[in-house]
Amino acid sequence: MARIAGVDLPRDKRVEIGLTYIYGIGLTRSQHILAETGVNPDTRIRELTDADISALRTAVEAYQVEGDLRRLENMNIKRLQDIGCYRGRRHRMGLPVRGQRTRTNARTRRGGRRTVAGKKKAPAKK
């Protein structure tokens, strides 16, 4: 099993797909890395040589991935919250940040529905 950037890549996947298991590397970046290193995208990870793995390792180190990327994102959000801008306040309140409506929808960001006590029904007329 190849270990790149602290992530064990699945042995039976193609290299192109296996690299996307690293946080911060999607399909497009994976294709760029493979073109840069000259590794065939269709080979399986178990078939890679040690030279291929070390080439991939050095190519991935050029990007911010995994813990560094997560830390950078959290620092950016914390900076927005510290300066007290609109986006920072929305992050702090757990609401959508990019201008989406919240009267309806936005359930992912706001969490599950809360039940609110409704008013009592009027007594039935006789």
Swiss-Prot record:
Gene Ontology molecular function: rRNA binding; structural constituent of ribosome; tRNA binding
Superkingdom to which the source organism belongs: Bacteria
Keyword presence, RNA-binding: yes
This protein's UniProt keywords: Ribonucleoprotein, Ribosomal protein, RNA-binding, rRNA-binding, tRNA-binding
SUPFAM superfamilies per UniProt: S13-like H2TH domain
Annotated Basic residues bias: 100-126
Gene3D superfamilies the UniProt entry points to: 1.10.8.50, 30s ribosomal protein s13, domain 2
PROSITE patterns linked: RIBOSOMAL_S13_1 (PS00646), RIBOSOMAL_S13_2 (PS50159)
Disordered: annotated segments: 92-126
Pfam families hit by this protein: Ribosomal_S13 (PF00416)
GO cellular component assignments: cytosol; small ribosomal subunit
Gene Ontology biological process terms from the UniProt entry: translation
Subunit structure: Part of the 30S ribosomal subunit. Forms a loose heterodimer with protein S19. Forms two bridges to the 50S subunit in the 70S ribosome.
Known role: Located at the top of the head of the 30S subunit, it contacts several helices of the 16S rRNA. In the 70S ribosome it contacts the 23S rRNA (bridge B1a) and protein L5 of the 50S subunit (bridge B1b), connecting the 2 subunits; these bridges are implicated in subunit movement. Contacts the tRNAs in the A and P-sites.
Similarity section: Belongs to the universal ribosomal protein uS13 family.
HAMAP family attached to this UniProt entry: Ribosomal_uS13
Protein name: Small ribosomal subunit protein uS13
Origin organism lineage: Bacteria, Bacillati, Cyanobacteriota, Cyanophyceae, Gomontiellales
Gene: rpsM
